[in-house]
Amino acid sequence: MENVFDYEDIQLIPAKCIVNSRSECDTTVTLGKHKFKLPVVPANMQTIIDERIATYLAENNYFYIMHRFQPEKRISFIRDMQSRGLIASISVGVKEDEYEFVQQLAAEHLTPEYITIDIAHGHSNAVINMIQHIKKHLPESFVIAGNVGTPEAVRELENAGADATKVGIGPGKVCITKIKTGFGTGGWQLAALRWCAKAASKPIIADGGIRTHGDVAKSIRFGATMVMIGSLFAGHEESPGETIEKDGKLYKEYFGSASEFQKGEKKNVEGKKMFVEHKGSLEDTLIEMEQDLQSSISYAGGTKLDSIRTVDYVVVKNSIFNGDKVY
């Protein structure tokens, strides 16, 4: 694996602009049978998404994935979303009761449009078996499987029946897998994405390590169809986390999915908790992301997201911020 780099090591090179205004650029993306306004999905984490935000996103044509940390609420959630004519997109784990849950959905003729199998180390027989189980009982559901960090894993999960794979092991801001285990794609997530995308025949969701809106464009350049983002979506008015005031400033909590705060216990901890500055409304962030991505498309010399996939780039080894703190 030569040529290892991460988001801050790369600059995309502009191509001749063909639009008069960035508003002519189209940021929509298709995943499965549905088209979404942005190639971005808030992380399926407890401090990022809840039922209210899921509903808001679905109503406004953004992709979402509900977290799996209140498993007993999932059936009513699917019913509720579908009764409003919205997509139902849920997460499952790989434990025994999740197999029963999938069978229960089939028995009740409930088919979520999207099911994400979401475990920290997704290149495993446990995930392969779950993909096959879902495909057997709910063949119409679009299955996203992860998380993985190698081309072998992408190929195996696709061959097992996954409709998309989620790439990223530990690059997230509240993820400490890299520190606790020594493993993962932290520090080279963008190169890992590129490596995996070359092997993929189905969509890839880049998950983790996004620190700026420009990183979304870079992810698209290196093969992502969709980009999952945690920290940039944390700390909004609507976010589920707790709000605290410190030195006259407002902050919201944000913690990792395998953290003791989420589990309620100190066992197999691979996540930490932090407080992020209160960011105002989620809608404003989504609009800003869309506008920034429209600008990216115009710099790429096109009118659609795909134009970003063919631009040239340079590797600048950690120098693009010149020591400036951006956010």
Curated annotation (Swiss-Prot):
One of its GO terms (molecular function) is GMP reductase activity. One of its GO terms (biological process) is purine nucleotide metabolic process. NADP(+) binds at residues 204-227. PROSITE patterns: IMP_DH_GMP_RED. Its EC number is 1.7.1.7. InterPro entries: Aldolase_TIM (IPR013785), Dihydroorotate_DH_CS (IPR001295), GMP_reductase (IPR050139), GuaC_type_2 (IPR005994), IMP_DH/GMP_Rdtase_CS (IPR015875), IMP_DH_GMPRt (IPR001093). Transmembrane segments: none annotated. The active site is at C175 (thioimidate intermediate). Coiled coil: none annotated. CDD domains: IMPDH (cd00381). GO terms for cellular component: cytosol; GMP reductase complex. It holds the Pfam family IMPDH. Belongs to the IMPDH/GMPR family. GuaC type 2 subfamily. This is GMP reductase.
